[in-house]
Amino acid sequence: MIKSLGALLIFCFQTLLLTAQDQQATEKVTVVGRMKDVMWKGQLYGNINLDTIIDKKQLYGLGPVEYLTGEIMIVDGRCFVSKVETDTSMRVEETFAVKAPFFGYTTIDQWKPQSLPDSVQSIRQLEDHIQRIVPPERRPVIFKLTGKVENAVVHVVNLPRGSKVSSPAEAHQGQVNYPVQDQEVEIVGFFSTEHKTIFTHHETFLHMHLMTDDRKKMGHLDEAQFKKGAMTLYLPIE
């Protein structure tokens, strides 16, 4: 009897421990694939099928489409994919039926909003600001921004079919840049000091995708001038 009770207690403890570990894992950022393998080794194929992510509720993520044929942005469990149509237009559709060669994602139950300081108007200033306010033990972190940008530039990768890639220059063949001016936007971003060439370019700790509120434009954010007093930064609540 005592042995049976002891075994039951051990089983219950292990179950609780596994449950706690599962909950902890959902709060962390998952990074699949590596940017440098795409840029330098030409590994363009999809390493993750986004349709296979089981828990899509309150999911956030970003990355390129496999074979570098578009951009992906997941906002609050909704997945948006952009593809080049012309030098001045793109197509944005909502679907999880897409694969990515590298991708970062997490589920976030609650956000803590804070006004973006007026001193933060550029991507570099945003990077410095996040590095100051997010302690190392909470990195990598996925965050979001909402509000109005005065000016921004996003790109959508558009590698010609059958292209071989062995350098960043080759990886960006066909890429189209799109301006965004005086528009309300939502930005999903990734910050880490430990993921250069894995999920961020070698010269930055940030990887961000921007989508306009009308959902007519979405892409990788390259340049931005944030409007003073009009942007809100959201960080996950611990």
Segments predicted by a language model, with ranges:
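Bacterial Sec-dependent N-terminal signal peptides
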Residues: 1-24
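Start-of-domain marker
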Residues: 24-55, 208
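N-terminal low-complexity or amphipathic/hydrophobic leaders
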Residues: 43-99
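Extracellular structured ligand-interaction cores
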Residues: 69, 140, 205-207, 218
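Contiguous hydrophobic, core-forming segments of folded domains
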Residues: 82-141
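Mid-length scaffold segments of soluble, non-membrane domains
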Residues: 116-122, 128-176
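Short, hydrophobic/π-rich interface segment
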Residues: 161-214
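C-terminal structured interaction module
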Residues: 209-238
